[in-house]
Amino acid sequence: MKFRVDDEVIVIAGADKGHRGKILKVDRDKDKVVVEGAARVWKHVRQSQKNPQGGRLNKEMPMSASNVMLVDPSTGKPTRIGVRYLEDGSKERFAKASGESLGQIAPAKASKAAS
């Protein structure tokens, strides 16, 4: 999965289709993301010492990563994410629609000849 926390995404499927928000959490094992303001549910909380008031909490639930697309920073439209190697050997993410860089993933690897 190529999503990162704080990426701006748009929901492309489901009840919140069209909603824009930042990614708050990424679960790579389950292939799910939590998007700010999307997939909100009421969680009923029982009274306890930790929560003496009890009541209902409105919280975001995880959604499948396939239901969101990254928003291209230059155009503001949904785009796919690609990975490319730079000349110095480091990897970066880029928006496929515009080719704009989305930040470095990994630094250049050290040469194996040195070992």
Curated annotation (Swiss-Prot):
GO terms for cellular component: cytosolic large ribosomal subunit. GO terms for molecular function: rRNA binding; structural constituent of ribosome. GO terms for biological process: translation. SUPFAM superfamilies: Translation proteins SH3-like domain. InterPro entries: KOW, Rib_uL2_dom2, Ribosomal_uL24, Ribosomal_uL24_CS, Ribosomal_uL24_KOW, Translation_prot_SH3-like_sf. It comes from the Bacteria. Gene3D superfamilies: 2.30.30.30. Part of the 50S ribosomal subunit. One of two assembly initiator proteins, it binds directly to the 5'-end of the 23S rRNA, where it nucleates assembly of the 50S subunit. One of the proteins that surrounds the polypeptide exit tunnel on the outside of the subunit. This is Large ribosomal subunit protein uL24. It comes from Rhodopirellula baltica (strain DSM 10527 / NCIMB 13988 / SH1). The gene is rplX.
